[in-house]
Amino acid sequence: MKVVLLKDVAKIGKKGEVKNVSDGYARNFLIPKGLALEATPAVMKQLKAQKMKEEEEKKKIKQESEELLKLLQKHLYKIPVKTGGSGKLFGALTNADIAKAISEKTGKDIDKKHIVLNKPIKELGLYEITVKLPEGITGKIKVEVVQEGKN
């Protein structure tokens, strides 16, 4: 019997796949547990429509991510911080601080998990920071760490 998997099933397949399984396994286990549906023409049509909708959503998210990255790359983000005498920061500049600076400058909220810091920033200077957005969109933005009061 052909079934459409509604969830990932070990040793059978992943969600959305059409698989051929024994009638008993389908009727007594997969279908009653809500793991699969019989692959009727109506179910297949619904599955196809759902896949198309998911693809459209992915395209939309990718386009929005590309536009956001272009917007982010247009600006230089100056972040004022308190420092000691030698230009070292009290504490460290984190991805949350950078996300806040981006939000203030562009008006676009960006999640701190999208900002990748290899190591915390502990000194004044100009840095290129990697930004990883949804759908694999990555790029670099410029962040300048300046002493508070000397903008």
From Swiss-Prot:
One Pfam assignment: Ribosomal_L9_N
UniProt KW NAD keyword: no
Record InterPro entries: Ribosomal_bL9, Ribosomal_bL9/RNase_H1_N, Ribosomal_bL9_bac/chp, Ribosomal_bL9_C, Ribosomal_bL9_C_sf, Ribosomal_bL9_N, Ribosomal_bL9_N_sf
Gene Ontology terms: cellular component: ribonucleoprotein complex; ribosome
NCBIfam families for this protein: L9
HAMAP family hit by this protein: Ribosomal_bL9 (MF_00503)
Assigned protein family: Belongs to the bacterial ribosomal protein bL9 family.
Descriptive protein name: Large ribosomal subunit protein bL9
Species, as recorded: Thermosipho africanus (strain TCF52B)
Source species taxonomy: Bacteria, Thermotogati, Thermotogota, Thermotogae, Thermotogales
